Curated annotation (Swiss-Prot):
Classification lineage: Eukaryota, Metazoa, Chordata, Craniata, Vertebrata
InterPro entries to which the protein is assigned, alphabetical: Cys-rich_flank_reg_C, Leu-rich_rpt, Leu-rich_rpt_typical-subtyp, LRR_dom_sf
Keyword terms: Glycoprotein, Leucine-rich repeat, Phospholipase A2 inhibitor, Repeat, Secreted, Signal
Listed name of the protein: Phospholipase A2 inhibitor beta
GO cellular component: extracellular region
Any one GO MF annotation of this record: phospholipase A2 inhibitor activity
Keyword Signal: yes
Known partners and oligomeric status: Homotrimer.
One Pfam family linked to the record: LRR_1
Length: 332
């Protein structure tokens, strides 16, 4: 099974941001030793959010518990808190002022909970955030107000929710964002407004969405975008030139869609572009020949060539497309 490159990148980025050197103590003892600044509370039987964290606390991990709510004062008196990990709990909602007075907070993980919505002003005070994960929840919509003050954010993970659309200009203020994960939602189309403001975006994961339409200029204005995953997105057709601005792309994953034909994605690709076309029902005709000629001329790295097989015409069904001679698929 092929690994999801964007997902692996997200894991590596999280790990790099969370390389701890301080001693870890499990849950806050009373009193806590002077040299302890990180606390891990991950008992499966824990139902209430712990209290008594010392003012010097920098990292709190309350994960894999039965905690379903936090009081609005739960994090007050912790001005040095830098990382808060609340994944794999039973959280259904969060109070509006929960994250106030946390000027040093740069990492917030709310993944794998039961969140269906969040208060409009929930992140207003978290202006130092560089990583925010709300993946694997039940969000059906995004609020513009969530992202208005997150100008330092680099990594945003919204995968595995129930999002059907991204509001116009939703990410406008995220000028420093480099990685955006919207995979495994219910998005049906991409439009230019969806990614407006993301001038520094480098990695974009959209896999496992029922995307059938990519509007022209959807990727315009993203000069640094280098990795795009559109794997398993129900794509049947891609408009010529939609990827044209991506001259710096190093990975374009179009695997496991319903594509039968594809024009060369970019006229002048980057020197190290990799392209995944596996798992599509390709029509092996002159248009496919043009694509393969482009691949050969620009020395594009094709993933798993043996899995790029013809579905049409019947005479070539099951044949490896790259093994066919030009005279066979385009005799004219």
């Amino acid at each position: 099974m092929k690994s999801s490159v964007p997902s692996l990148l997200f894991v590596s980025l999280v790990m790099s941001l969370n390389s701890y050197t301080q001693q870890v103590l499990y849950c806050p003892p009373d009193p806590a030793p002077e040299n302890i600044t990180e606390f891990v509370c991950n008992s499966p039987s824990l139902h209430e959010f712990p209290t008594g964290f010392p003012v010097r606390t920098k990292i709190i991990s309350v994960e894999f518990t039965q905690v379903s709510s936090l009081g609005v004062e739960a994090l007050q008196g912790l001005p040095n808190l830098q990382e808060l990990h609340l994944s794999n709990n039973r959280l259904k909602t969060l109070p509006s002022g929960l994250f106030r007075n946390l000027p040093e907070l740069h990492t917030l993980d709310l993944s794998t909970n039961l969140l269906e919505d969040l208060p409009p002003e929930i992140f207003t005070s978290t202006t130092s955030l560089t990583l925010l994960s709300i993946s694997e929840n039940r969000l059906a919509k995004l609020r513009l107000s969530w992202f208005e003050t997150l100008k330092e954010l680099r990594i945003l993970s919204l995968d595995n929710n129930q999002l059907k659309e991204v509001p116009i200009s939703c990410f406008d203020k995220l000028e420093k964002l480099t990685f955006l994960d919207l995979s495994s939602n219910h998005l049906h189309r991409l439009s230019p407004d969806m990614f407006s403001g993301l001038d520094n975006l480098e990695r974009l994961s959209l896999e496992n969405n029922p995307i059938r339409c990519i509007a022209p200029k959807s990727f315009h204005g993203r000069p640094k975008l280098s990795i795009i995953s559109l794997k398993n997105c129900s794509l049947t057709n891609i408009i010529t030139g939609v990827f044209q601005p991506l001259n710096h792309x190093v990975l374009l994953d179009l695997s496991d869609n319903e594509l039968t034909m594809l024009d060369p994605p970019v006229a002048i690709p980057s020197a190290n572009l990799s392209l995944d076309l596996t798992g599509n029902p390709w029509a092996c005709n002159c248009r496919m020949d043009n694509l393969l000629t482009w691949v050969k001329e620009h020395k594009i790295d094709l993933y798993s060539k043996q899995e790029i097989v013809c579905a049409f015409p019947k005479s070539f069904k099951g044949e490896e497309a790259t093994s066919l001679h030009r005279s066979q698929i385009c005799p004219c």
